[in-house]
Amino acid sequence: MKKLFPLLMLFGLTLLSCGSDEDSLQKIDQIFNLYIQDSSGKTMLNPSKIGSFTGVSFNDELADKDIANVNFSRKMLEDSTYYIEYIAGATRKFVNDEPDGSKIYRSLIEVSLTKKISDTQNDPVVIDSMEIFYRSSPSVFEVSRVLYNNQLVFTKVQDQPNTATITK
């Protein structure tokens, strides 16, 4: 029994130390959804429709290499609206420290869009830029704002999805 007591005590302390404190977890909110539509509100990201951007690619402009593809997913809502879901993959460079103690990082992505104009022809590739700023603190890592072609298209609103719509 004398040998069992220290083992039970050690086991009990181990269980107590494994408890988690929800406040100590950092919330990650880095999914960004990009919608591209025409002036009438029609989706322009349908991968097979004439008049849409059937070819889309992302290139990391802050990477060490000239060609550094960035992964994204083209997704579709139930109403057949297509959008791009970007989660992560581009280089993040430190920008500055904020007065509240958080840190700001940025990614710069070249967005190449190929528009299908007939069954056999495409328009010349459109090259756009997307600059994503992130805020990092002990409690949260989140997309804070997004510039598309140097125009502010997204500013973070707490508990809202990170979504922007571009009209072309």
List PLM regions with ranges.
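A short, Gly/Thr-enriched small/hydrophobic beta-strand-prone motif that recurs across taxa
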Residues: S24-Q37
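Glycine-rich, aromatic-bearing surface loops/beta-hairpins
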Residues: D119-K168
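Tryptophan-paired
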Residues: S52-S118
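Bacterial signal peptide processing site
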Residues: G19-E22
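C-terminal motif of bacterial Sec signal peptides marking the signal peptidase cleavage site
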Residues: T14-S17
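Positively charged n-region of N-terminal signal peptides that target proteins for export
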Residues: M1-L4
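Short amphipathic, basic-aromatic surface patches that mediate peripheral association
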Residues: I36-K49
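Short coil-to-beta strand junction motifs in C2/discoidin
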Residues: I28-D29, P47-V56
